[in-house]
Regions:
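Short, structured protein-protein interaction patches enriched in aromatics and acidic/basic residues
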Residues: 45-59
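Compact, glycine-rich, soluble single-domain proteins
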Residues: 31-40, 45
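C-terminal structural segments of small proteins and small subunits
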Residues: 56-90
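A generic structural signal for short beta-strands and their flanking turns/coil linkers
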Residues: 4, 15, 52-54
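Phosphoinositide-dependent membrane-docking surfaces
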Residues: 16-24
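Short aromatic-glycine motifs in intrinsically disordered, low-complexity regions
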Residues: 1-13
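Short, charged/polar surface micro-motifs in flexible loops or helix N-caps
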Residues: 13, 25-30, 39, 61-63, ...
Length: 90
């Protein structure tokens, strides 16, 4: 089984098969999860100093924050899926 990687900004990629959810960082419960993940050493910041827009929850318990929106990541995921299925050309 091939691992599908999706670009989440600034040279960072994620393994799609490990993602549980894409979440908005504006909600209080998500802010709490981010704070707890920082305390437990499970936090990954790939914003490069920009405003965090999306929190990505992984099956390992890690939380990554990215400066791109969840919609942008979803569009990249759809495009990658269509490329791998041969529906569109490279």
């Amino acid at each position: 089984m091939a691992m599908e990687l999706v670009h989440v900004g600034f040279g960072s990629v994620i393994a799609v098969n490990r993602v549980v959810a894409f979440l908005s960082v504006d909600q209080q419960p998500i802010k709490r999860l981010i704070r707890e993940s920082k305390e437990n050493g499970l936090f990954i910041d790939v914003t490069h100093g920009r405003k965090a827009k999306t929190a990505i929850l992984f099956d390992t318990g890690h939380i990554m924050v990215a400066a791109v929106t969840a919609e942008t990541i979803a569009h990249r995921l759809d495009t990658a899926s269509m490329l791998s299925e041969g529906k569109i050309g490279p």
